[in-house]
């Protein structure tokens, strides 16, 4: 019924997969679909950060290999859950483009943000297990969290500042020792669980961050808060991932 309502509102013909007899096209498709792995799959432009944007031809092999080698970086817990992602970065950028292919490969449910201004509300609706971000977005989240926490006043502000101080000292793999981890557990229950709920990230398992350098304090804060941030580096020409950290191979 929802599809019927949508069809009534658009001017273009609308087809639903259930109404199509795709099997009748199988032999016809086999006769002309001959895609070589080295053929161009997409033509994208670089961001122009260090010079004039240039066009980049990426082959099917480029993208497929990037997908296959990126999947092991997904925390294993995600593979056994309903995998929901929120997409807000432009798909004309290779970072988001490749991840969309990856999402389809593993059967993820993709939710699209309405706009940059509604990301917080969209996170609340989607309740994603993973989403992609850029450092500027995480910076805005961080600034808003700190401002609200300190504005609470009294005991609440004191507890928040204590938790914030702990978070900014976070080190991966329990390097700060058992006493620190015990205190962090308390901070997560008292403060950071509320932060995750406010951001719509109760179910989050990974935030893939790229396109610019991530400030160490942001990495420490969000990881301490139970919002794992994985920072990647890549180029349009490398389709795009070159390196990414993860808790599969510990290290920050």
Identify the meaning behind each predicted range:
Residues 180-182, 203-209, 214-252:
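Conserved ATP-binding loop and adjacent catalytic segment of the adenylate-forming AMP-binding
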Residues 1-23, 30:
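Structural core segment of the AMP-binding/adenylate-forming
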Residues 3-10, 55, 66-73, 138-152, 193-202, 216-220, ...:
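Adenylate-forming
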Residues 25-45, 52, 78-84:
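Conserved pre-ATP/AMP-binding loop-to-beta segment of ANL
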Residues 64-84, 91-189, 203:
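Conserved AMP-binding/adenylation subdomain of ANL enzymes
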Residues 41-67:
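Conserved AMP-binding A3 loop
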Residues 40, 46-49, 85, 90, ...:
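Conserved S/T- and glycine-rich ATP-binding loop of Class I adenylate-forming
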């Amino acid at each position: 019924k929802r599809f019927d309502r949508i069809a009534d509102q658009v001017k273009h013909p609308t087809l639903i997969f259930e109404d199509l007899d795709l099997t009748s096209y199988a032999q016809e498709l086999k006769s002309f679909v001959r895609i070589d792995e080295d053929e161009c799959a997409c033509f994208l432009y670089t961001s122009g950060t260090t010079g004039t944007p240039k066009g980049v031809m990426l082959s099917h092999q480029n993208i497929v290999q990037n997908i296959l080698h990126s999947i092991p970086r997904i925390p294993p817990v995600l593979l056994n859950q309903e995998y929901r992602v929120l997409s807000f970065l432009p798909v004309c950028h290779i970072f988001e483009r490749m991840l969309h292919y990856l999402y389809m490969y593993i059967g993820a449910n993709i939710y699209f943000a309405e706009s940059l201004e509604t990301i917080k509300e969209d996170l609340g609706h989607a309740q994603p297990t993973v989403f992609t971000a850029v450092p500027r977005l995480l910076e805005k989240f961080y600034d808003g969290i700190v401002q609200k926490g300190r504005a609470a006043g009294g005991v609440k502000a004191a507890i928040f500042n204590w938790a914030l101080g702990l978070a900014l000292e976070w080190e991966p793999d329990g390097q700060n020792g058992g006493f620190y981890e015990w205190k962090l557990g308390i901070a997560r229950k008292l403060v950071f669980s509320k932060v995750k709920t406010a951001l719509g990230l109760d179910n989050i398992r990974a935030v893939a961050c790229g396109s610019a350098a991530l400030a160490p304090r942001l990495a420490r804060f969000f990881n301490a808060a139970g919002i794992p941030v994985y920072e990647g580096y890549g180029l349009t020409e490398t389709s795009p991932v070159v390196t990414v950290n993860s808790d599969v191979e510990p290290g920050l």
